[in-house]
């Protein structure tokens, strides 16, 4: 194979060498700061909020109010696009009986800075602090929702917290496992402790639901099972037959949203 054809594989290998390497940030995050919806285009009852992470970076969030509910869901999206491209998901989630606090990672949409693993964990902590300390929600009335790379923020944040529940959609288990999936097993030992979902989930106290498509080629369902198997709290695993990585909430909407609705109702009732 010509050297130029091998270049992407070398770049991916470099990405996986260490969580501190800028290359991992380059390949792991694909922020979009250009697609911004005007306020009048947002769902009714949506408030734009800004708060600061502990390192001073200004972070944006959208709060979809739900006056008929005393619970709220902090939502962490995937690695591409931004919060404005997921408005339909937020609307659907609110219709299930929860307020929604959708967080824009640093470097995405109107948030300042550049994304990194450590940085998005700071953003998650700051979001939780804002929801509890400024908005006044007690932890037992808060759900945390993470999809794809957002599962890493959600899991990191949920550790040891007395929250209502954790929802993980298509979660990765670790950078090490992702390296193997990409055919870069030789680099797996060098990934350190990057994105260690399966390790961190052991410190989860709250109920957990993991949702994964059986035909996910980006983060295979085996990773979701690894995360699920490592959890020791009350837990549920739901596989959606035939679903891939990016079509769960639309093509398989009926099944997907029913699972989430049932989990919200059951977990909130028990708190």
Located regions from the model:
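An N-terminal hydrophobic leader/cap segment in hydrolases
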Residues: 17-52
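Short beta-strand/loop motif that positions the catalytic acidic residue
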Residues: 203-205, 210-212, 216
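Hydrolase active-site cap/lid region
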Residues: 151-206, 254
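Alpha/beta-hydrolase fold nucleophile elbow
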Residues: 137-148
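C-terminal catalytic histidine-bearing segment of alpha/beta-hydrolase fold enzymes
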Residues: 225-229, 233-271
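Short alpha-helix in the alpha/beta-hydrolase fold that links the catalytic acid
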Residues: 89, 197, 206, 220-229
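Acidic catalytic loop of the alpha/beta-hydrolase fold
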Residues: 215-219, 246-247
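Membrane-embedded segments
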Residues: 54-130
């Amino acid at each position: 194979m010509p050297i130029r054809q091998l270049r992407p594989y070398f770049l991916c290998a470099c990405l996986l060498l260490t969580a501190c390497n800028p290359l991992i940030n380059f390949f792991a995050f694909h922020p979009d700061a250009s697609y911004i919806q005007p306020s009048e285009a947002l769902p009714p009852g949506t408030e734009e909020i800004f708060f600061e992470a502990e390192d001073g970076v200004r972070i944006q969030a959208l709060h979809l109010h739900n006056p008929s509910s005393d619970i709220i869901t902090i939502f962490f999206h995937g690695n591409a696009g931004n919060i404005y491209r997921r408005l339909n998901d937020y609307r659907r989630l609110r219709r299930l009986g929860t307020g929604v606090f959708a967080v824009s990672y640093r470097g995405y949409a109107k948030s300042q800075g550049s994304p990194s693993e450590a940085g998005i964990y700071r953003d998650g902590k700051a979001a939780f602090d804002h929801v509890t300390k400024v908005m006044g929600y007690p932890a037992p009335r808060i759900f945390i929702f993470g999809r794809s790379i957002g599962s890493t923020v959600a899991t990191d944040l949920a550790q040891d917290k007395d929250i209502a529940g954790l929802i993980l959609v298509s979660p990765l288990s670790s950078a090490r496992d992702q390296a193997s999936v990409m055919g870069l097993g030789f680099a797996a030992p060098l990934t350190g402790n990057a994105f260690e979902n399966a390790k961190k989930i052991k410190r989860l106290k709250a109920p957990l639901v993991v949702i994964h498509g059986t035909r996910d080629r980006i983060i295979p369902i085996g990773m979701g099972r690894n995360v699920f198997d490592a959890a020791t709290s009350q837990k549920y695993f739901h596989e959606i037959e035939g679903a891939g990585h990016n079509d769960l909430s639309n093509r398989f909407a009926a099944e997907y949203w029913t699972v989430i609705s049932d989990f919200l109702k059951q977990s909130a009732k028990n708190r």
